[in-house]
């Protein structure tokens, strides 16, 4: 399923990625917020140019391509946010990009990826098509580099740049970071960036493969008939060896959240922080609000993406909780 990783991600790589990101983009805000009588902080990566943290890993990976690799172009797999990150970086660097995306991805994400100039190759997620097999075949056919959404050491390091920013803004490493977790790219990156912080991955109910993997000490895939979830951005069947090697024995036990808890978190972020946060980007906040992770004043919650269809978001806000 996953191609062998060419190397392991390192904290030195995270620091190098952070310097590259700092030269390109301003830090996203670290916002104080009170939950259950405790003042914590929320890292608002919803305010990145593409509306999500994925720009970090994409920029670090594409700027490390060799001249021949850059000339050939890249392939990526994504439900939307990594797609936009790769497309944005590719446009800035003049690199061709083709993105394998599920046909049922939010329309706003499909449109934004195409608007950034990337080729979009659709696959049937609901029908069980193997997105990684499609991407690997395209790489072999076109002689391109695969920029995996999470199973890539450069991507992991790039996502970890968020942790370097957080520590600088907070004036210390956080006591704990509550992380929206799909494949584990951001989770692993933050574990490398903040070695003194407890790392709490949060996944949708029924898509909690990281939680199960950490419990059993080996990679576990989502079951054959997982439930539907509104958290499309972190709807991932399994983590990858390169991510799990970082997180095994390092991350705290994972937790999962329901769609109702996620919607409550989206409303909370809109009401208290005046931010539009997509379902997958609100999972960590949902866990905090539901009391599933302990909080203290040095806790940081990641708000990882804000790319959601306007009509669906408006309907969610006005619906009875």
Model regions and ranges:
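PLP-dependent amino-acid enzyme catalytic core
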Residues: 1-321
């Amino acid at each position: 399923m996953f191609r062998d990783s060419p190397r392991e991600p390192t904290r030195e790589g995270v620091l190098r990625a952070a310097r590259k990101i700092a030269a390109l983009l301003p830090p996203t805000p670290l916002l104080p917020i009170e939950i259950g009588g405790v003042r914590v902080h929320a890292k608002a990566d919803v305010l990145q140019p593409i509306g999500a943290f994925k720009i970090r890993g994409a920029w670090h990976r594409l700027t490390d391509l060799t001249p021949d690799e850059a000339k050939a172009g890249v392939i990526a797999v994504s439900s939307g946010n990594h797609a936009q990150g790769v497309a944005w970086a590719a446009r800035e660097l003049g690199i061709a990009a083709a993105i394998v995306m599920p046909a049922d991805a939010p329309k706003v994400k499909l449109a934004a990826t195409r608007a950034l100039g990337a080729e979009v190759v659709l696959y049937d997620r609901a029908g069980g098509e193997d997105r990684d097999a499609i991407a690997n075949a395209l790489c072999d056919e076109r002689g391109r580099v695969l920029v995996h959404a999470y199973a890539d050491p450069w991507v992991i390091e790039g996502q970890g740049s968020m942790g370097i920013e957080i520590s600088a803004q907070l004036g210390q490493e956080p006591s704990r970071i509550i992380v929206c977790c799909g494949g584990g790219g951001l989770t692993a990156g933050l574990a490398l960036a903040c070695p003194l912080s407890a790392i709490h991955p949060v996944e949708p109910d029924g898509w909690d493969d990281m939680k199960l993997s950490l419990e059993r000490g080996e990679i576990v895939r989502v079951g054959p008939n997982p439930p539907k979830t509104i958290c499309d951005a972190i709807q991932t069947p399994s983590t990858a060896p390169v991510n799990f090697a970082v997180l095994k024995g390092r991350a705290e036990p994972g937790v999962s959240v329901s769609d109702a808890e996620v919607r409550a978190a989206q409303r909370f972020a809109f009401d208290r922080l005046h931010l539009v946060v997509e379902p997958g980007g609100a999972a960590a906040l949902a866990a905090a609000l539901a009391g599933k992770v302990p909080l203290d004043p040095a806790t940081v919650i990641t708000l990882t993406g804000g790319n959601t269809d306007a009509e669906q978001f408006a309907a969610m806000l006005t619906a009875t909780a």
